[in-house]
């Protein structure tokens, strides 16, 4: 059973909001043979311009489901986040079940589901629902240059990319800088 930890930032989580979140995201349970004992971490944040950001993270045994959406309407945002999570589960289900079939093992992770009609959500930014094999269409090899994170951001901007991989001059480890949806930058550092 999926349990919920719902936190509001600049917003009081009412019973109506809590019930809506639990009802919508709880429908993901239908994709599992054995419903995982998982905790869905839900963060709802309201900004001054009345935009709402909904973040959902569900750590499972073999995969972490995560989706985020900003929307003017809280309930529409919850619907969009649920759709994204559902697509992630379907893609993962397809990969895992295909892998188990080729190795002659029983389908361990996700049950086949009666396809429910998609809920009426206008998601203009929807990802394609292609559940076919993952196809790598381009491969590159290059040497990582030692630099600091500021220089890596400049290189990323010069190349017009959304991320840049480099060797951190201070730690000598591999790091990644990336551009976030809010226009700011993030840094991922690897550990030994």
Swiss-Prot record:
Region (Disordered): 95-129
Coiled coil stretches, renumbered: none
A cellular-component GO term for this protein: cytosolic small ribosomal subunit
Single GO biological process annotation from the record: negative regulation of translational elongation
Subcellular location(s) per record: Cytoplasm
Superkingdom classification of source: Bacteria
Protein keywords: Cytoplasm, Translation regulation
GO molecular function, one term: ribosomal small subunit binding
Compositional bias ranges of the Acidic residues kind: 120-129
Name the record gives this protein: Ribosome hibernation promotion factor
Taxonomic lineage from the root: Bacteria, Bacillati, Bacillota, Bacilli, Bacillales
This protein's encoding gene: hpf
């Amino acid at each position: 059973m999926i349990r919920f930890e719902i936190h509001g930032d600049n917003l009081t989580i009412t019973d109506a909001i809590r019930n809506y979140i639990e009802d919508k995201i709880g429908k993901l349970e239908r994709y599992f043979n054995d419903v995982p004992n998982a905790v869905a971490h839900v963060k709802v944040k309201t900004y001054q311009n009345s935009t709402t950001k909904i973040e959902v993270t569900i750590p499972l045994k073999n995969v972490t489901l995560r989706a985020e959406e900003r929307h003017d309407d809280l309930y529409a945002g919850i619907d969009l986040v649920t759709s994204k999570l559902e697509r992630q589960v379907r893609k993962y289900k397809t990969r895992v079940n295909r892998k188990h079939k080729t190795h002659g093992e029983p389908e361990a992770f996700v049950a086949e589901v009666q396809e429910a009609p998609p809920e009426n959500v206008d998601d203009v930014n929807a990802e394609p629902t292609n559940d076919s094999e993952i196809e790598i269409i381009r491969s590159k090899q290059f040497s990582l240059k030692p630099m600091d994170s500021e220089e890596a951001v400049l290189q990323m901007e010069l190349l017009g990319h959304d991320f840049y991989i480099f060797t951190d001059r201070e730690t000598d480890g591999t790091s990644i800088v990336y551009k976030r949806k809010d226009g700011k930058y993030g840094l991922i550092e690897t550990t030994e």
